[in-house]
Amino acid sequence: MAIKVLVVDDSSFFRRRVSEIVNQDPELEVIATASNGAEAVKMAAELNPQVITMDIEMPVMDGITAVREIMAKCPTPILMFSSLTHDGAKATLDALDAGALDFLPKRFEDIATNKDDAILLLQQRVKALGRRRIFRPVVRPTTPTPPPRSSASSVLGGVSTHTQPAPVRSSHAASIRPSGKQYKLLLIGTSTGGPVALQKILTQFPANYPHPILLIQHMPAAFTPAFANRLNGLCKIEVKEAANGDVLRPGCAYLAPGGMQMMVERTGVTGRVKVLAGSAEMNYKPCVDITFASASKAFGGDVLAVVLTGMGADGREGARMLKSAGATIWAQDEASCVVYGMPQAVASAGIATQSISLDNMAESILKESARG
């Protein structure tokens, strides 16, 4: 049975094109369209769609208000469309706070010109959210879409992909006994669902968290400054968008800039961030694999790396390199993920040693990071 989709936008052109693109996929079906947030709230309750695509700026009722009302009355996975501006980034983050699960940049030219990658991306995101199981009391079984092959392995130097899988323990924070390792760096990589997950985790960290933190979130260049500023205002630790040459400091989180690659190099007892344009052949900018791989070379086993919710398999090959160097790798568990793609890739390959719920992740990291 096709995933039922409600398309919400005040532009008749955009409603029509999004509907056409969604309906091109046999696994998807647009059941209705709405021209403002008020109509969306009404249709969501009446039609029970499995996914809603939502514009932000609309008459009568804006998209953020509509998200709040829908999540209060009939929780439904919502994909936001956002303009690539500072105000658009802020509004999108507000929508995610209100309960939306994911977003896509609103590029009229890509939609209008039938650009293949834009079409595929929209279809993939809608299907991923349509498989989100937490929202519905009755769930139809689905088969997860195999994560797309990353081009990172060639860039990272031909890492072997034949690690024998080992069982992954699903753990509660109380059940995790600190390993006693003395870490020098915390890495967190994520994609779909990441902004909310990162906020939940990092707001629980104390100001004196003992290690530098590198954050890799798939996000456009226009969004990462606003996201870093938001986290910095909410967290006790410092959060900043990473800049080339930043010296790593304990209790500071460095967010990889959108459209760039973030690497780390060792400089004496600490490290330094390198921000590069990177290869055009990479699927993701920023790419979790790139940051993880550089950390394996710079810090070896002195790293705790966590892979959170996200679509695809970015992070798997970099995590494999980290594990080979002696680092500790954790993954978010399936039940608490918006999309169980990136964590599944790490867990099913036998790279992650723990599978931890989002609710328990911060406490688990703090216990493991505590200096003896």
From Swiss-Prot:
Active site: 191, 218, 314
EC number(s) recorded for this UniProt protein: 3.1.1.61, 3.5.1.44
One example GO MF annotation: protein-glutamine glutaminase activity
CC per GO annotation: cytoplasm
Catalytic activity: [protein]-L-glutamate 5-O-methyl ester + H2O = L-glutamyl-[protein] + methanol + H(+); L-glutaminyl-[protein] + H2O = L-glutamyl-[protein] + NH4(+)
Compartments, record wording: Cytoplasm
PROSITE patterns named among the record's database cross-references: CHEB, RESPONSE_REGULATORY
GO biological process: chemotaxis
Keyword Cell inner membrane: no
Enzyme class: hydrolase
Residues of the CheB-type methylesterase domain: 179-372
CDD domains, per the entry: CheB_Rec, REC_CheB-like
Lineage top rank: taxon: Bacteria
Name recorded for this polypeptide: Protein-glutamate methylesterase/protein-glutamine glutaminase 1
Organism: Shewanella sp. (strain MR-4)
Gene (UniProt): cheB1
